[in-house]
Amino acid sequence: MRLTEVEKDLFSVDPQYSLAHCISADFALGAGIAKQFDTRFNMRYELFEKYGSYHFTGGKCLKIGSVFNLVTKDKCWQKPTYKALREALEDMKKQVVTLKIKHLAMPLIGCGLDKLEWDRVRELLEKVFADTDVDIMVCYR
């Protein structure tokens, strides 16, 4: 696993990269980077089409196209826990390994409106993906 942090627009990465970001189980996608995913990929509609009414039971990863939606909380106004984020990352890892995906790009997940600490989140990413050969690019602006 290789994790790099780059000052870059997430949506300008090479198409070989699958994207990942955090969402709530109510699929609100009304603010922050989640809103940009909804605008660019009609993500809210796609999530409802594929998963319907989703009930939060812990961290989970819902894949739509080349986007991994990390469900880390029930409602959009709540804050996630590191436990839920870890569960979502572990679920994403299983899917990435199964699908033989080698390149992931994401924002500073959980650290914008969700207010998690990047140092702890980076540590989780490194632990979860340690035994893979996935290239993770973290984009920030």
What kind of feature is each model-predicted range?
Residues 1-141:
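Macrodomain-like recognition of ADP-ribose-binding/processing modules
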